């Protein structure tokens, strides 16, 4: 998704009953499989559990389109969906934001800012490649919170009402093309592939953050240079 608008298509209605963004500390596999929690959906496979969905779209005639709404800031990421919420992120030289929309209507429910010292530094403006921009990674949700990471290395966690749970900086990544890896989750762990620099510099890491607090649980060196893939759980 670049900038401008988000489109949403019609799908069969599922009754989620009492399942909501509260309850257990992390979602069950059944919850994950009937939502779209991160980049390329459940397990990063690009496979949806839904059937009888539109296979044709036309922005001019509205064929296959339920609604369309503006996105406040540009981002190269993809939308994620959890029941009645759609999440996106965006950014420009003036700020980094996370957005939440109503699945049924496309109404913007909230937008929240992250604080980035690196972005707002007066000494040297933060520069990004046009192909990646400030918000290339797709956000991740566990059905209780939503997590977003940006080109600056800043990570923000918000609950479903838009309250900031925590914010953390991993430092500006040394990545010539810009940071674009989307996070994934295992139970309460937010897994971040943070590749940067050259292989000889040994700057690249796989990092696990506690989804509740943002604290680093563990990190493992990766013998690679800067790259742009995203981790998946198998």
Residue ranges and their predicted role:
Residues 1-234:
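Noncatalytic, solvent-exposed loop/strand surfaces
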């Amino acid at each position: 998704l670049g900038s401008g608008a988000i489109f949403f298509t019609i799908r069969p209605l599922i009754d989620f009953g009492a399942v909501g963004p509260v309850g257990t500390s992390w979602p069950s596999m059944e919850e994950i499989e009937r939502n779209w929690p991160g980049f390329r959906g459940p397990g990063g496979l690009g496979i949806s559990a839904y059937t009888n969905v539109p296979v044709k779209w036309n922005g001019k005639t509205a064929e296959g389109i339920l609604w369309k709404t503006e996105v406040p800031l540009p981002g190269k990421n993809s939308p994620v969906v959890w029941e009645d919420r759609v999440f996106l992120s965006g950014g420009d030289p003036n700020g980094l934001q996370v957005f939440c929309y109503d699945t049924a209507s496309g109404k913007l429910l909230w937008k929240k800012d992250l604080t980035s010292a690196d972005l707002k530094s007066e000494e040297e403006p933060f520069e990004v490649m046009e192909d990646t921009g400030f918000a290339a990674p797709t956000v991740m949700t566990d059905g209780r919170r939503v997590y977003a990471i940006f080109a600056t290395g800043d990570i923000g966690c918000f609950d479903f009402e838009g309250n900031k749970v925590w914010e953390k900086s991993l430092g500006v990544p040394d990545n010539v093309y810009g940071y674009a890896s989307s996070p994934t989750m295992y139970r309460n762990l937010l897994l971040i592939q943070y590749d940067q620099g050259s292989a000889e510099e040994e700057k690249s890491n796989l990092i696990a953050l506690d989804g509740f607090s943002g604290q680093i649980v563990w990190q493992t060196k990766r013998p690679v240079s800067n790259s742009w893939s995203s981790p998946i759980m198998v």
